[in-house]
Each structure stands twice: as C-alpha cells, then as structure tokens.
C-alpha cells in the first residue's frame, strides 16, 4: 500500500499485490499491518507528552520510576554458565532508553552471551519460561532488569528493548495501562481507529499475512510467518510492546506522521 499526503490531505492512496499469497487475496487500501518497530515513534511521543506535562525529565534515572533497575549490573566476563558482573559506571537514564544507549539488547541478535540469557529468561519471546504465559510490562521490566547490561548506560548505541521499557515507565507515571494511555492521548485525538496491540475478530478480514524472504542459491522465496487472524496479534495480549507491538493501517499512521509534520498539531488539536 502506498500513501502520499500533501497539505494535510491524502493526495494518493493505492494498493497492489496480495494480503495472502496462498489464496491470492488482494491487498486493500485499509488493510491492517503489523507495524512492528514503527511502534517506537508512537511510544516516544507518549513519553514526550509526559515530559511536557512536567511528569518526568529526560535526565531522571530509570530507577526513579522502575525501582527494579536500581541494582542492575553490567556484564564483565565469562561464559553463559559462569560469568561475572560489575556495577555500571553511571545509572541508566530516561534519555538512554529513548536513544538506545541503555545497555539493553534484543533476543534476536547475535554475538554476545547476554543475548542467550534474553532467550532463556523469556525476554526474547516476552513469555514466562515456567508458566509459558505472556508477560505483562511489569513482569517484563523486572525480568529485563535482572539480566546483565551489555555495556555501561550512555557508553554507546545498541538497538534494544529500551522502548518496551519506556512503555512500563508510562504505565507507572500515568497510573493507567499503556494501551489505554495511547488510546486516550494519541489514537483517539488522531482518529487512528484501526490502531491497537491486537486486531479484533470483526477486522480479521483486513488483517494481512506476514512473510519472510528466504534467500538461497537456488532462488529467493517467501515463507509465511503469520496468518492474519490466527497469530498472537489476533486477540488481546498481555505484552503491550512499545517497541514493536502495534497493528495499524497506512491511513491511521499517516495521521500520526501529519501531526509530527505540523509541529504536534492535528485538526486544530495540539497533541504534542
């Protein structure tokens, strides 16, 4: 789906291809996609709303809102079965979460023993390894804080679950669930009617399948990873991922982008 906006209006909106390759079901202009990491800008705007209200500072320590991060440690040396940790040279700040300089990582990455800990602890899947149930943001934050950081906060950049942790910060400061906060202050004012952490059953017909490109010497092909209406995004979830959990349409997300282009204003409302 392609959308072009000009002068606060949609100038072009068209679709081509399939929402399901197997059934040759065509993409629609209002098809619902998994927006994955395009969730991050929305979570970041939510944080800046709290900043504008004076409810947090970017230089505040994360542990001010999430006490579980007060005693977080940094990986020092060793192996996955026998390792040493040390205290960080400086505390993790809110701005470190916003800029991916927190020392956190992602479970799908490679090259460091801590990443394996993300998988065995359930952080990678956001599922408790014992109960097999999906974590909520509180449990996710506590589990993440129990694992070593890759490096001292602020030392360097590394893509990570930092924005997911900000989702929990929003819950603690606002006293509301993350999804309710987004609906009240972002989705409803921006008329983002098809944006949520799951796609309700009445919209499954518009929910596209998700594919991965498999590259090989004999030629590339598509592998279906998720089928619209049958995956974890097709029913209410416990894990409200601020880093990659939203589903939406291009028209909805265009409203969000238009608000940013208008210096925080949308249809006469000052959102940010």
Task: Locate the predicted segments by residue.
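Outer-envelope exported proteins of Gram-negative bacteria
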Residues: 1-5, 61, 160, 183
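PAS-family sensory/regulatory domains
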Residues: 63-68
């Amino acid at each position: 789906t392609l959308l072009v906006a000009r002068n606060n209006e949609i100038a072009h909106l068209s679709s081509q291809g399939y929402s399901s390759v197997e059934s040759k079901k065509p993409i629609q202009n209002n098809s619902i996609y998994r927006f994955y990491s395009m969730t991050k800008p929305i979570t970041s705007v939510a944080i800046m709303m709290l900043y504008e209200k004076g409810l947090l500072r970017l230089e505040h320590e994360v542990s001010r809102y999430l006490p579980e991060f007060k005693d977080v440690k940094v990986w020092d040396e060793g192996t996955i079965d026998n390792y040493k940790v040390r205290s960080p040279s400086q505390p993790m700040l809110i701005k470190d979460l916003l800029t991916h300089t927190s020392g956190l990582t992602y479970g799908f990455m490679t090259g460091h023993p801590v990443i394996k800990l993300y998988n065995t602890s359930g952080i990678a899947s956001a599922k408790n390894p014992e109960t097999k149930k999906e974590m909520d943001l509180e449990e996710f934050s506590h589990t993440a804080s129990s694992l070593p950081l890759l490096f001292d906060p602020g030392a360097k950049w590394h893509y990570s679950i930092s924005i997911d942790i900000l989702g929990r910060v929003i819950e603690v400061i606002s006293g509301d669930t993350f999804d309710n906060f987004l609906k009240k202050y972002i989705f409803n004012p921006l008329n983002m009617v098809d944006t949520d952490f799951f796609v309700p059953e009445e919209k499954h017909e518009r929910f596209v399948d998700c594919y991965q490109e498999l590259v090989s010497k004999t030629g590339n092909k598509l592998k279906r990873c998720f089928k619209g209406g049958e995956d974890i995004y097709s029913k209410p979830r416990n894990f409200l991922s601020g880093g990659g959990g939203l589903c939406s349409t291009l028209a909805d997300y265009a409203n969000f982008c238009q608000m940013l282009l208008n210096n925080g204003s949308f249809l006469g409302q000052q959102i940010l």
